[in-house]
């Protein structure tokens, strides 16, 4: 990077004086604040001011502002003492914070100008920031969108999570396929987090239950680690309100180091508690194939719940306006705890334990408080994702909590027997404890449903399936407990900041930028969908985004792609139910047909660039085989001189929020092709639709509602419906399935070895046969393949009509208003949490 004199900007300009000013909002003052941090926040040698130093100094100048706003918000919440929501999630997928904070504070211009005076462009400095590795997929990104909306809507709410040092993993692609290496986002430090040395809570593991003479019970002995709080400020858009994502780190105490053993040379033994504490926040979702892996995952979940609840209770007392401590009966009127999936389920027995054992409440009072405080969001109908923990493991790690869970279960079962004789034969499936002697487990979803005041699904279809199938008997007991809250995304990060050209066009045609916080205003674009001037501007914004994406793809993968081709993208966690395998088999068939065509025929086809990205869990063999297949197909297709003008295939490595912010604005077709009934909602479909990308998809998750909103004619639909899936699986078992010739042709082409010597037999075998483990095409790739290929042919035809395609694209954006996380969170606030806005004056 060169400064105005054409020299590399490696030192600070002497003419700008260093001055700390958290309230700086013009370019000169901001530049002074950046220089101040470069000089006096001594993370680096003072002799340099390279791009990395510029990032940290810029971030810290912003952090000053955020801390001031955070303090004002905290003081205001303490003064008003509103009911507050606490959002518990094992994952947050924040993405880069710099551009988001600058955008939410509306300081893009001043910061860009300030950095120019220091010899840098804002975009270049933003590129230096690493994504916080606190999540993996949609669950974590949803939590982050929700925090943005909570702050923007001025709601009294906080997030709680864990400070993972190495995240899930960083994905690298080699000749072997996907390989995993640790994330390094904290290798230096994060400029956004504020360590709170005064916020430390003890968290116990193992031990035993001590029965006191008065009959009360106490959990004692075992290991005790310290939970230390790190706060990440979350600014709202266009408001002073700045809330907190509080992340916990596990530490051992100084006295837990055995100096005698250490001085005897027994270093590992002397520091074993320090080592065990450090393991808790090392990675997200440690492998759980071993007993130790399961134990570590359970430790993570309990650590999050215990530290967060102790903090929540501390704040409940801190805000007391009366003399002495508050009445516990007030707790549910001041505290709402939302469990994001089943990972934080241990909040239920832990809150019971804290109330009874530490604060002397009786069972009935503690249960009344707990069951009025906690609510549960279900995110899946996949059996493997409905957590079940071994009872023996739970007794070992959390003996007091198992006693409490047993008592909850006993009382629930007794209530059923007393009030619902008709459900007697369902008790074994309704109960929290599955006491099967072969494998006794605790069913966490059942514990959530029994104990929560509200249970919600995350899309209308998903919620309907929960009520009709998964939780049907519970619905007959508590019909009013179940709700739907269709997921949403923040329009700030997913349109305003990631596609500024398109946002400016929207603002120009709507004659207001209020759509950024009131996304329903996008419907105003419908009246202009046929307007040639808008279509021309829309196309130029799309082209700019496609060119930017093409440059990124070449830089990261070395593959040169044509920005005039149709950009077809599928990015999400690699899983068989999400059916990336169907996508790549469709590509294989397209490649084979292109190879068979004469050159004149090829010229009549629609050139297409297919991009696939996402991480496969390290132990999920078939998912990793799919990643390998995509890369092998890409290697062959992209180097084929006859075809590569008309088809390119790219695997985009290490998919994360920042990569998504590059891919989504440049997309034209996006694939959301899960087996119907298996995707709870999905949120990437909303991000693509908001950016004017057309969707090819099944009637699954939020696709159903997106299609309703954007118009059936603007959605490429295919595939079986959720209610047909069980019958189709049964027919497959009975040998009644007849595969489409195109499907067989694609599979045989892969088996022929044209894409290399790797043995794809085990992967393709999952699509063969009628029954058996890992066989029988459980996800209906074969059944849906012909309608998928027909829908892809319709895509090609539609893309040839440029005006028609642009109209569909505009209508896609115009129909995306419903899918703002502001709408979702406003519904949670009103219908589940019963909280109100608390704006900082």
From Swiss-Prot:
Q: Which UniProt keywords apply?
A: Allosteric enzyme, Carbohydrate metabolism, Cytoplasm, Glycosyltransferase, Pyridoxal phosphate, Transferase
Q: Where in the cell is it found?
A: Cytoplasm
Looking up PROSITE patterns in the UniProt record yields: PHOSPHORYLASE
Primary residence: cytoplasm
Q: Tell me one Pfam family matched here.
A: Phosphorylase
What is a single cellular component term in the Gene Ontology annotation?
chloroplast
Asked if the keyword Glycosyltransferase belongs to this entry, the reply reads yes
The cross-references to InterPro entries, in alphabetical order and at most eight, read: Glycg_phsphrylas, Glyco_trans_35, Pyridoxal_P_attach_site
Q: Which residues carry this modification: N6-(pyridoxal phosphate)lysine?
A: 687
- A Gene Ontology molecular-function term? glycogen phosphorylase activity
UniProt catalytic activity: [(1->4)-alpha-D-glucosyl](n) + phosphate = [(1->4)-alpha-D-glucosyl](n-1) + alpha-D-glucose 1-phosphate
Name this protein carries in UniProt? Alpha-glucan phosphorylase 2, cytosolic
The entry sums up its family as follows: Belongs to the glycogen phosphorylase family.
Start and end residues of each stretch annotated as Disordered: 1-24
Which organism encodes this protein? Arabidopsis thaliana
Encoding gene per record: PHS2
An example GO biological process term is: response to water deprivation
**EC numbers for this chain:** 2.4.1.1
Name the cofactor(s) required for activity, per the record.
pyridoxal 5'-phosphate
Q: Which Gene3D superfamilies match?
A: Glycogen Phosphorylase B
Role according to the record? Phosphorylase is an important allosteric enzyme in carbohydrate metabolism. Enzymes from different sources differ in their regulatory mechanisms and in their natural substrates. However, all known phosphorylases share catalytic and structural properties.
